[in-house]
């Protein structure tokens, strides 16, 4: 009920697992959460703020003005927020990120 969607963990048929080059969550009030995380000293980023059909390089296709054709893509683009993830991120720092998000979303 906090409006938070975490990445889905899946295992490939060969036993492989995701390595998370980016750890992207979806949250309803993304911009507000991003500002509050930044204020708390926690890095975050919106890597893909626009859907493909909204990007200038595809404007000649005529889809940039009709978001209702892609409501799920538009929703995801408006909610996606990438959190810090890198090999040197300690478990304590991971815990701090998770606890801060939990506190900010309550």
Per-region residue spans from a language model:
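PLP-dependent aminotransferase class I/II
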Residues: 1-106
């Amino acid at each position: 009920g906090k409006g938070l969607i975490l990445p889905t963990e899946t295992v490939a048929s060969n036993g492989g697992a995701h390595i998370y080059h980016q750890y992207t969550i979806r949250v309803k009030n993304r911009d507000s959460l991003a500002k509050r995380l930044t204020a708390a000293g926690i890095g975050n980023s919106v890597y893909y703020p626009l859907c493909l059909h909204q990007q200038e390089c595809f404007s000649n296709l005529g889809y940039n003005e009709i978001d209702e054709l892609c409501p799920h893509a538009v929703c995801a683009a408006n909610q996606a927020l990438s959190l810090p993830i890198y090999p040197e991120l300690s478990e304590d720092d991971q815990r701090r990120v998770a606890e801060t998000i939990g506190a900010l979303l309550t």
